[in-house]
Amino acid sequence: MEKSMQPIQLFELASRQAEWLSVRQEVVATNIANANTPKFHAKDVSPFEAVMQATSQQVGMARTNPAHLGESTLSENIAVRDNPVNNEIGMQESGNSVGLAEEMTKTGEIKRQYDLNASLVKSFHRMMLMTVKR
C-alpha cells in the first residue's frame, strides 16, 4: 500500500487564526477608542471555533491556480456583534457599555494568542527546515 504525503494544514490554520486575531484586535481597539462616546455599545467577534466551522462548511469552486478566482476571505465570516452588558460594570449614564478593564483584558488575551500562534509557526518551520537539510 502506497502512502502519499498529505498537505500540511498548520500554516493555513495559523494564518486564519492570525487574521481572526487581527479583526478582534481592531474591534477591541474601537471599543477602547469609544469608551467615552455616549450610547456606544461594546462589540466583540464570534469565537474562532465558530468561524472555522462556518468556513469549513463552505464548498469552494475547484480551480487550477489560486490566482484565478478570488476566494472569500476569512474576514467575511467573522461576525461582529454587540457584547452583552457586563453586570459588574453595567450601563453608564451616557448609555455606553464599554468596560475599559474588560477590553484591556481582551487585548492581553489577543497578544498571548498571537504570540503562541507565531511561536508554533516558527517552531514548525524550523522543524521542517531540519527535515529538509537531512
From Swiss-Prot:
| Annotated compartments | Bacterial flagellum basal body
GO CC terms: bacterial-type flagellum basal body; bacterial-type flagellum basal body, rod
- Which protein family is it in? Belongs to the flagella basal body rod proteins family.
InterPro entries associated with the record: Flag_bb_rod_N, Flagellar_basal_body_rod_CS, FlgB
**Sorted alphabetically, which Pfam families does this protein's record hold?**
Flg_bb_rod
- The gene for this chain is flgB
Record's protein name: Flagellar basal body rod protein FlgB
Function, as annotated, reads: Structural component of flagellum, the bacterial motility apparatus. Part of the rod structure of flagellar basal body.
| Keywords (A to Z) from UniProt | Bacterial flagellum
Q: How does it assemble?
A: The basal body constitutes a major portion of the flagellar organelle and consists of a number of rings mounted on a central rod. In Gram-negative bacteria, at least four rings, L, P, S and M are present, whereas Gram-positive bacteria lack the L and P rings. The rod consists of about 26 subunits of FlgG in the distal portion, and FlgB, FlgC and FlgF build up the proximal portion of the rod with about 6 subunits each.
Q: Could you tell me the Gene Ontology terms of the biological process aspect for this record?
A: bacterial-type flagellum-dependent cell motility
